């Protein structure tokens, strides 16, 4: 007879864990939740707000097998993930399998490795009902909002629409950004750049590329400045050298992994999570839903050893980072490789690429700062007060840059063609003008969200948690309120006026502007639903309210608030608003516009909104 039954939520995780335990352990999978709310009913008691859970039909046979094995076992170990969702899965198992909460062992671990699993078996705990209740609060609140808002949309906007608490706020961000872009008026300005020559000690000449410290708002002013430069002499007013240190980025959290995998690998948010899940379940990385940047002392030690072996002692600089995001759980760890000695892995191309990114980010976080010398050269003329500035950087010691450099959404826009290595140069050096040019540029408006930048914004506002970012972004696209696509740019003329010798030559060019790829765009129906919810349910759509709800979930998880009290308070305010909007009379649905009167029938004629425009 088996003595121990271990239940996890995924078959891949079960397979990995089974390798680490003896013959007296059997590992089974629950395949996620074995109980949930009914799909087509509210399934929440109107008076008590208690949820009525059911076992879905497709889980009945599995539950039967789990019950049979639980009866045979001397001990049952519930080993679902260490977050609130995982705790709820364990609680549902406890309830459905008729397990005694006091004698059932709950085990948690950050990674699926033999030492971690054995340590968890040595240190079991009881179910944490605070975590379970925080999950129940989220599930019930989201069901109430979705179930009660959707019929309002059916009646007032269009049948078959749906709304969700976090998803609707995410759509609001995208709609508002689109409107900012439409309202933005780009203004021209003129940037002045110069290329000077300096004579070196051996008689050869080197180029010094510079930019003027002033921009002009009119073409006439820019040309007038070029005229002043015709008979101007130029010399170096001063040279400043400044040592800079660059720190490595902290190890990955869920959101930073999603953002960096999008920028560096081109992965969607959901793709990143699917690949990370496979790496975790194979025992290759730690748990992938986390908002902590902490590393275990074991990992810090292993990283130090690996860095010294691969790059040398001077590259090692062990450090721990501290988490600053709202609601972060310091007990958890950042996303890191389980074994730093594994610099690469076998697997699919996606798995190898994501693992490589995680390994490099973790290693870099434990490496020395990059030491850089920044040189700024001020170039003056007796003809005017403005200065030309040349910037140069020399990497004195590459440190963590040897392995990894963090990217940003603005990388492409911030590339400076006039930042370069400078030749030997000192105060008083006389420079020869080669060319000075005025380039017409335009002020840049806001850019549309990518999946990665939307995750960053949600995290910044305190909306959602590591487990909700990917589902939120998937849901708003599945509902077709938002589409991921490309925005075709427009051709825009601009002029470059170049002074060479005593002649100013204009060159007219055309550039493509506003061309965006893989951006989140609101659909027409997404805009209509957003505007309807903003007008009628401003509290639900408020960013601060949504962030406050997340904080209340955290309070419940910490045992500082009763989840049923939170639900009752919310429903008491929400229900009357729903009733008021539902019963309000209106001549036509949201998103419809009256075109005129039908001359035959005398009835008004409306244009209706479809998903992608008027119909």
For the regions a language model picked out, list residue spans one by one.
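Short, polar/flexible loop-turn hinges at active-site or ligand-entry regions and domain interfaces
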Residues: 52, 80-82, 99-105, 124-132, ...
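C-terminal or mid-to-C-terminal helical accessory/interaction module adjacent to the motor/catalytic core
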Residues: 112-196, 238-245
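Metal- or metallocofactor-binding catalytic centers and their adjacent structured scaffolds
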Residues: 216-252, 426-429, 437-439, 548
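Basic, low-complexity terminal or inter-domain segments flanking catalytic cores
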Residues: 3-5, 16, 150, 160, ...
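Short acidic, hydrophobic short linear motifs in intrinsically disordered regions
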Residues: 236-240, 247-261, 286-290, 445-457, ...
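A conserved hydrophobic secondary-structure block that centers on an alpha-helix together
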Residues: 258-260, 264-271
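Intrinsically disordered, low-complexity regulatory segments
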Residues: 1-139, 148, 408
């Amino acid at each position: 007879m088996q003595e121990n039954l271990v239940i996890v939520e995924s078959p891949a995780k079960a397979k990995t864990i089974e390798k680490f335990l003896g013959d007296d352990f059997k590992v089974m999978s629950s395949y996620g939740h074995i109980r949930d709310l009914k799909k087509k009913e509210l399934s929440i008691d109107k008076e008590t707000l208690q949820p009525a859970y059911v076992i879905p039909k497709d889980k009945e046979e599995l539950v039967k097998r789990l019950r049979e094995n639980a009866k045979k076992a001397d001990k049952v170990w519930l080993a679902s993930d260490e977050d609130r969702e995982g705790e709820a899965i364990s609680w549902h198992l406890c309830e459905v399998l008729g397990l005694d909460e006091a004698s059932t062992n709950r085990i948690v671990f950050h990674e699926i490795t033999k030492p971690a699993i054995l340590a968890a078996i040595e240190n079991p705990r009881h179910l944490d009902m605070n975590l379970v209740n925080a999950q129940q609060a989220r599930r019930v609140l989201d069901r109430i909002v979705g179930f009660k808002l959707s019929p309002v949309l059916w009646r007032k906007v269009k049948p078959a629409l749906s709304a969700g608490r976090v998803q609707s706020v995410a759509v609001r961000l995208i709609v508002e950004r689109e409107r900012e872009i439409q309202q933005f008026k780009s203004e021209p300005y003129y940037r002045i750049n110069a290329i000077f020559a300096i004579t070196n000690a051996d008689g050869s000449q080197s180029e010094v590329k510079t930019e003027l410290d002033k921009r002009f708002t009119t073409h006439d002013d820019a040309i007038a400045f070029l005229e002043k430069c015709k008979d101007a002499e130029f010399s170096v007013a001063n040279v400043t050298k400044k040592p800079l240190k660059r720190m490595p980025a902290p190890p990955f959290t869920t959101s930073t992994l999603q953002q960096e995998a999008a920028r560096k690998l081109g992965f969607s948010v959901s793709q990143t999570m699917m690949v990370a899940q496979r790496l975790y379940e194979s025992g290759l990385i730690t748990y992938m839903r986390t908002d902590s940047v902490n590393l275990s002392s074991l990992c810090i030690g292993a990283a130090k050893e690996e860095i010294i072996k691969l790059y040398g002692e001077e590259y090692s600089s062990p450090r721990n980072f501290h988490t600053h995001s709202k609601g972060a759980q310091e007990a958890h760890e950042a996303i890191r490789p389980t074994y730093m000695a594994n610099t690469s892995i076998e697997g699919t191309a996606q798995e190898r690429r994501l693992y490589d990114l995680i390994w490099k980010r973790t290693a870099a976080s434990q490496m020395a700062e990059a030491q850089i010398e920044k040189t700024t050269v001020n170039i003056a003329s007796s003809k005017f007060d403005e200065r030309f500035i040349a910037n140069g950087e020399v990497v004195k010691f590459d440190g963590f840059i040897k392995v990894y450099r963090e990217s940003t959404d603005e990388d492409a826009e911030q590339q400076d063609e006039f930042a370069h290595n400078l030749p030997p140069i000192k105060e008083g050096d006389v420079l020869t003008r080669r060319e000075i040019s005025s380039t017409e540029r335009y002020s840049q408006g806001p850019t549309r969200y990518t999946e990665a930048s939307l995750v960053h914004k949600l995290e910044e506002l305190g909306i959602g948690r590591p487990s909700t970012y990917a589902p939120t972004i998937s849901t708003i696209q599945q509902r077709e309120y938002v589409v991921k696509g490309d925005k075709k740019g427009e051709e825009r003329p601009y002029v470059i006026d170049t002074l060479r010798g005593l002649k100013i030559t204009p060159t007219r060019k055309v550039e493509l502007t506003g061309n965006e790829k893989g951006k989140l765009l609101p659909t027409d129906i997404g805009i209509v639903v957003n505007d309807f919810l903003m007008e009628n349910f401003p509290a639900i759509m408020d960013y601060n309210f949504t962030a406050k709800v997340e904080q209340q979930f955290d309070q419940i998880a910490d045992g500082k608030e009763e989840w049923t009290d939170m639900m009752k308070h919310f429903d008491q305010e929400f229900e009357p608003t729903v009733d008021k909007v539902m019963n309000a009379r209106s001549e036509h649905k949201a998103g419809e516009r009256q075109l005129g009167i039908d001359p035959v029938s005398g009835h008004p004629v409306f244009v209706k909104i479809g998903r992608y425009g008027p119909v």
